[in-house]
Amino acid sequence: NANNNLPQPDQVAQLVEKQNIQYLRIYDSNPKVLMAFSNTTIELMVGVRNADLSAFQSQSYVDSWLRNSILPYYPATNITHITVGVEMVDSLDDATNLVVPAMRNVVSALKTANLQDRIKFSTPLSSAVLSPSYPPSEGVFSSSYENVLRPLLDFLEENQSPFMVDLYPFYAMNNGDSSLDYVLFKSSSSIFVDGNTGLSCNNIFDAQLDVLHFALAHRNFSRMKIIVTETGWPTRGSPYASIDNAQTYNTNLIRHVMDGPGTPAWPHEELVVYIFSLFNENLKQGPETERNFGIFYPDMTSVYNLVFPDKGGRSWCIASSQALDSDLQY
């Protein structure tokens, strides 16, 4: 468990609605959470946990999971995406080979229910699948992941599924790779010009995203949609982790996404971004930063003030490691 102190799902649903958050990502398919978000306008991205990927190699198991864990709540609960595993491809072990077969079984189950066009599916990857690339137009995938990326990209293309990625400019800052203004969207001028394209960039988030855009384009997948399934900033645990920096990063990120116009290399592509995370996670393993990405405390008071706009019908997304105390891997 990553939390043992969270509010009840119906309280979380009320909080999310009150904050004008329109899109929520959870990391499992807990029935209490799915029930809590029924008859709301919130669009839900649900997840298959890494621990369940072995079971998802069986089509009959996946059919049963869809029938028992998803369909009873749909469409009253507006489930729009299913994520299959989380950052599994990064591990470079045998488990990575479970992802695409599991997704194939999910597709097959959705087709049986005639929902393949209504519920999209993919698997979130970390930016580790990209080679360190500068400038962005030199972006390529790391050859270490070739064996798993080739079938994954073909599968996503075949099913018109989005490429999901977790991007954290915070770690560029934490590793000393960048200036704070560049990472917090505070640079008013260009931080570099891509010599190959002549395009200038003024923040690290866009630069990281364009590395991915070019990596996909170099593989002839330039039309593949990208969803940033996690980004955020911790409030404690490192010299750059502070309430002030977290508020600045997420506020400026929201403004950047809402104002458009995409990234320098893909200016017409609408940005779809999920902020991690709704709550701090008091039991999460690892450095202190890992437990302090939340924008709310478990008592539902704000860690800092973040305004979620509703401009022209476009609203905001939040990734919640769990919307209650459920049996999660992280």
Regions found by a protein language model. Name each.
Residues 6, 60, 93-100, 199, ...:
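Soluble non-cytosolic domains of exported or imported proteins
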Residues 24-27, 85, 166, 276:
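Conserved residues at the C-terminal ends of beta-strands
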Residues 10-16, 28-38:
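Internal amphipathic alpha-helical repeat/solenoid segments
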Residues 34-144, 228:
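Substrate-binding cleft of extracellular glycoside hydrolase catalytic domains
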Residues 13, 104-108, 117-123, 129-130, ...:
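Substrate-binding and catalytic surfaces of secreted/luminal carbohydrate-active proteins
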Residues 1-23:
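Boundary/entry segment of secreted carbohydrate-active catalytic domains
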Residues 22-33, 43:
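General structural concept
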